[in-house]
Amino acid sequence: MSHRTSSAFRAERSFRSSSSSSSSSSSSASRALPAQDPPMEKALSMFSDDFGSFMLPHSEPLAFPARPGGQGNIKTLGDAYEFTVDMRDFSPEDIIVTTFNNHIEVRAEKLAADGTVMNTFAHKCQLPEDVDPTSVTSALREDGSLTIRARRHPHTEHVQQTFRTEIKI
């Protein structure tokens, strides 16, 4: 496979042509990097415009983003974990919560009367090791917040077993 036919080459070429053709925006021209920048800086600058909202400073708390401006928060409440997600644009029949392989996934799809998709939502996260995956429950409140709870396994004291085995030759 030639390097000119690789998907990385096509993506870079496409990005360069779209960047150079959008001369109407002065902000995109000011963000253009010279050719001598290291590859990682170039890659970061290419994607930071599209994905910059996902990069959180280390000082911000970790939360589950629901919508721009609305974040869900994970909490430990006694013997359970709980997090909420803003789903006010969706009705209960639009929302599907699934658990699999120690992960939880929230998906929603709002359809228009003509069958076209008006709005979608998807979030997937890994459950902590001490969660019972069969105990996951969800409830949609009247204010549109979806609350998901999962029970923690009872804390058991881990006792390291020590033993010795002799094998006769």
Curated annotation (Swiss-Prot):
Primary location: cytoplasm
Entries under CDD domains matching the protein: ACD_HspB7_like
Sections of the chain in a coiled coil: none
Localization: Cytoplasm; Nucleus; Nucleus, Cajal body
Organs and tissues of expression: Found in both cardiac and slow skeletal (soleus) muscle.
Region (Required for localization to SC35 splicing speckles): 1-70
Biological process, per Gene Ontology: heart development
Taxonomic superkingdom: Eukaryota
InterPro entries given in the database record: A-crystallin/Hsp20_dom, ACD_HspB7, Alpha-crystallin/sHSP_animal, HSP20-like_chaperone
Region Disordered: start-end pairs: 1-37
One GO location term (cellular component): Cajal body
Biased composition (Low complexity): 16-32
Alphabetic keyword roster: Chaperone, Cytoplasm, Nucleus, Stress response
GO molecular function: filamin binding
Stretches assigned to the sHSP domain: 61-169
Family note: Belongs to the small heat shock protein (HSP20) family.
Subunit note: Interacts with C-terminal domain of actin-binding protein 280.
Name under which the protein is recorded: Heat shock protein beta-7
Organism of origin: Mus musculus (Mouse)
Taxonomy of the source species: Eukaryota, Metazoa, Chordata, Craniata, Vertebrata
